[in-house]
């Protein structure tokens, strides 16, 4: 078993002391009828196919947020769509939980010589247009995979809170990869911290993240898979395995221009996305009243706009190969 740890991010993110805080007022195919049916609650739209499997909305507001997250993660990876040592030419590629399909679309545009790029999701929210080598399917990856197509590369990103049995999912990835094929998992470690003590443990942002973890554990869908991903791919038989770790700030307080940009996007993610995070899980699972959730959401938005709180997430990428 070969496990490599790639170069760690810098020890600390340098703070731009001139970065201002902001006001919260300044803010981003053919299918069956059952698949196209949606649920509406909390003023938002949710998927109807295998309802409840994904606890967050899928409406236009959420789609815009997911596209922004794609840009954020791509920037964190220095404008790379993947880290696996893969030449996509002639390869079959799967994007698990494709969401709006933006990663698959960008892969198709960037690598027109890739033989096939498939994006699957519970929600049919992908565009009808796509590069010639890209197609989308509505499917539940937690069930037995109907598609028996062997892949050369499987990409799985931002699925925290969506999967009940991660080891089983990773075993299915292993089974559907060709020998020598690659699996890449990308997830944030969903416990916030600061390097200078500016994020109190009782902050609204920290309380929200803790509540999301507790709520997802109650429904059997871990909100923090990142710390366990390396172990799961080892147990599935992948070898070699490389672990990469990056830092994502919340806010425009870093001096580094790229981190400042990424932090600004993560700030928007909190300000615009907090309602989507908390609406269902905090009321239906944790038993909070709508008024209590509204107070939390307001506090999260206000803290995210402050540049004197230097909150950080770690972002983990696991790159693992199926042996020949």
Swiss-Prot record:
Biological process GO terms, please?
methylation
Give its E.C. classification number: 2.1.1.-
Q: Which GO terms describe its molecular function?
A: methyltransferase activity
Entry's SUPFAM superfamilies? S-adenosyl-L-methionine-dependent methyltransferases
- Which Pfam families has this protein been placed in? Methyltransf_23 (PF13489)
Q: In which pathway does it act?
A: Secondary metabolite biosynthesis
The induction annotation reads: Expression is positively regulated by the cluster-specific transcription factor pytR.
The UniProt disruption phenotype note reads: Abolishes the production of most pyranterreones, but accumulates pyranterreone 5.
The answer to whether UniProt assigns keyword Signal to this entry is no
Give the span(s) annotated as Disordered.
Answer: 1-28
| Enzyme's top EC category | transferase
Entry keyword set: Methyltransferase, S-adenosyl-L-methionine, Transferase
Q: What does this protein do, in the record's words?
A: Methyltransferase; part of the gene cluster that mediates the biosynthesis of pyranterreones, a family of antioxidative compounds. The first step of pyranonigrins biosynthesis is performed by the hybrid PKS-NRPS synthetase pytA that condenses 4 malonyl-CoA units ato the acetyl starter unit by the modular PKS of pytA. The acyl chain is then connected to an L-serine through the amide bond by the modular NRPS of pytA. A tetramic acid is formed and released from the PKS-NRPS pytA to give pyranterreone 5 with the help of the thioesterase pytI.
Q: According to its UniProt record, which protein family does this protein belong to?
A: Belongs to the methyltransferase superfamily. LaeA methyltransferase family.
* Protein name, entry field: Methyltransferase pytC
Q: Which organism is it from?
A: Aspergillus terreus
